[in-house]
Amino acid sequence: LELALKIGVKRFILMSANGVRPDGTAYQRTKWQADEALKESGLNWTIFRPSLIFGDPGGEGRPEFCTQIRDDMLSLPFPAPLFYNGLLPFNAGSFSMSPIHVKNVAEFFVKSIKLKVCEKNIFDLGGPEALTWKEIIHQIALASGKRTWKIPAPVVVIKIAGSILDRFKWFPVTRDQFTMLMEGNTVSTNY
């Protein structure tokens, strides 16, 4: 930020994340701290906080959400998990997300450069509809020609497994990622 000020950057655009806060997971706290530092920097800034981003499965070795779900959950010889809190699975897979395509996020970045209304403003970005985890799993399965059978999976079991296994690279999700997944990831306004 100091260098951006020094060289006279006209607008600093930051990719943050939906759900950032000072008391969240390490990822959420780090993103929140970056947002706060930029807001206090003296720069002209715009912050985008997208919901779940999908698209571009060839993106420089970074995991793409739908591809990762297909490979890590739908290609296995057992049902896809529908996570739930509590003792009974009545709400299995019911948390929601507003997925947004990476190209839409990129368009917002580009368009914001010339729009005065975007200066010193934060935008939550999400797709046109909120989908439950159950619906997302179903749609990815349909699109990839995979089976769609699912089974309720209690959060407590996954968290215990994650606390033991998330240090291994082959384990598909960290404890923090799982915590954020269960919080849901929707936005109140879709841009």
Annotate each predicted stretch with a short phrase.
Residues E2-L3, A37:
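Short, conserved SAM-binding segment of the class I
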Residues L5-R11, S41-L43:
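A short helix->loop->beta-strand "cap" motif at the edges of active sites that frequently abuts
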Residues F12-A17, F48-P50:
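SDR active-site strand-loop-helix element
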Residues S16, G184-N185:
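Short secondary-structure boundary segments
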Residues N18-G19, L52, V155:
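Conserved beta-strand edge residues that scaffold enzyme active sites
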Residues D23-H138, L142:
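Oxidoreductase cofactor-interface core, primarily capturing Rossmann-like NAD(P)-dependent enzymes
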Residues A106-D176, V187-Y191:
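Mid/C-terminal beta-alpha module of Rossmann-like enzyme folds, strongest
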